[in-house]
């Protein structure tokens, strides 16, 4: 096996931590000696041992003189675990092959520098693109202190998320819906607007056996969420946050008694200030959010600049209907040049349906738009 093959194995190991390591990154490590794999491990859960330590602990023989393959630069600071560079040095590892550099300001090249200063041969950027993609959530969060937000919706090929009567179950098939449940396990939070609660009364939990429920975040400017809704009735079992501009203590108390947490935020254009909400959630180590909002909230999120990714599940169906709901509403952009452009798109077939996943590239405001607003 060559360096890339060992790193691919480390990547597969890292993915086993998906949904459990937040707000830490997913990391995998492989220890090889004289062409044999003698140890492997991954970061299994937040607060527990890191991948490098687990890989060394699993070694079937002395790792002295071996090579370690690790998807992310080893840490060099004390957190919930001791520095991984110390563990590597103590084990007598001769060479370290790294996939991604760690943008965490506490690491940021220091881990690699320490290893080299102690005479260890370090090879960088092996399968870097794949390793970077694995931890795009962590990279965003650790550098911005705000959650990585993925806007998710299911629609027909004519762009409808419901019929003109409001019916939306089900647009996509079972395979696509199961994929969504895996996303709910993967993301630390799930966010909707009060309109979704009023229309569908969703539970917003992860239905995968053994999966982790995301923190539920409801944007509810005036606290209209029914006390008998599923999210409120189960708030003592699943963490639930109501983000609101309503400062009425009596209204807030009813939700708090049910187990909800009420975040009273500033208003922006008549709605919850989403930037302020993201800053607050980031401070609470919510590093990622699956946005399952309706057209109004989705537009507000784009307009606020908080969305990093779009996941569009597309069913080969046509609903039609002038009044049928679409995934993004709001004012819209006045000119094609002002569009929110998407890049690095990926297409995946899920049964009869398709998922298009793209990164959001925010536009510069065109001069003609600026003039039209004056």
Cite the ranges covered by each PLM segment.
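Enzymes that bind and transform nitrogen-containing heteroaromatic metabolites
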Residues: 2-8, 13-17, 22-24, 63, ...
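A short, flexible N-terminal coil/short beta segment enriched in small residues
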Residues: 10-14, 23, 34-41, 130-143, ...
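Proteins enriched for Cys/Gly/acidic motifs involved in redox and nucleic-acid/cofactor modification
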Residues: 19-23, 112, 126-154
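Helix-turn-helix
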Residues: 28
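Short capping loops/turns at secondary-structure boundaries
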Residues: 104, 108, 124-127, 142-146, ...
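Generic structural signal for helix capping and beta-alpha/helix-loop junctions
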Residues: 105-106, 132, 298, 320
